Curated annotation (Swiss-Prot):
Keywords: Cell inner membrane, Cell membrane, Lipid biosynthesis, Lipid metabolism, Membrane, Phospholipid biosynthesis, Phospholipid metabolism, Transferase, Transmembrane, Transmembrane helix
One Pfam family this sequence matches: G3P_acyltransf
Entry GO terms, CC: plasma membrane
Name the UniProt record assigns to this protein: Glycerol-3-phosphate acyltransferase
Taxon lineage: Bacteria, Pseudomonadati, Campylobacterota, Epsilonproteobacteria, Campylobacterales
Gene: plsY
Length: 224
């Protein structure tokens, strides 16, 4: 297949178009934009250098402590919305569950490797939350609750995020077998495999490797 034929095929294939859109939309660096526009500061030069909510909080706290919490929450909402919107679009177009899960994964990859910031970005947690809420809402909401409880107890963002992710994945191995979940919100009924969710989990753990190292060395800062 020639290069031109490949391009034409891509432009005429709705799945391929959505894959590209998911990556590009997921790559919108809302945290970076908020801090850059409001305070003329590049959060990639501060703290963990991530563009996610935790580093937004850390960066803004040094400049305007009264706004730090609100901008951090806004960043979480916006980053989660990226994943939610692309999956919702796929659902409305009647795409297969396999495609929906692929789109969710690509939105997360886009956030972590933003094409607008030299393929650098955040840790992917908020975008993952938004991506899976429409696919596995029961486990997703339970994971959010776990995240909130662990955050309140330990007050360390990375611990709450990682345990929340583990909890969500673990529940997909349990809840579909003990609760009569509708086929449309059960990963087993959707695609008969946990593979995409496990890949998302592994990827989020990968982006948190520096945090995990700091946890073991006792150097991870409390933020929440």
């Amino acid at each position: 297949m020639s290069f031109l034929s490949s391009v034409l095929y891509t432009l005429s294939n709705i799945n391929m178009i959505f894959y590209i859109v998911a990556f590009l939309f997921g790559g919108i660096p809302f945290g970076w934009l908020l801090v850059k526009v409001l305070y003329k500061v590049d959060i990639r030069d501060i703290g963990s250098k991530s563009i996610g909510a935790t580093n937004v909080y850390r960066a803004v706290k040094e400049i305007d402590e009264s706004k730090a919490k609100y901008l951090s929450i806004l960043t979480i909402i916006l980053d989660a919305t990226k994943g939610l919107i692309v999956v919702l679009g796929a659902k409305l177009l009647g795409m297969s569950y396999e495609t929906q899960w692929s789109i969710a994964l690509l939105a997360i990859l886009g956030h972590c490797y933003s094409p607008y910031l030299g393929f650098k970005g955040g840790k992917g947690v908020a975008t993952a939350i938004g991506s899976v809420l429409l696919l596995i809402p029961v486990e997703g909401i339970c994971g959010l609750i776990i995240w909130g409880i662990v955050g309140k107890v330990f007050k360390i963002s990375s611990i709450s995020s990682l345990i929340g992710v583990l909890g969500t994945i673990g529940l997909t191995f349990v809840l579909p077998y003990i609760l009569p979940l509708p086929d449309c919100i059960s990963i087993i009924k959707q695609i008969n495999t946990h593979t995409p969710l496990v890949l998302i989990g592994l990827f989020i753990f990968y982006t948190h490797i520096p945090n995990i190292k700091r946890l073991f060395s006792g150097e991870e800062n409390k933020v929440l």
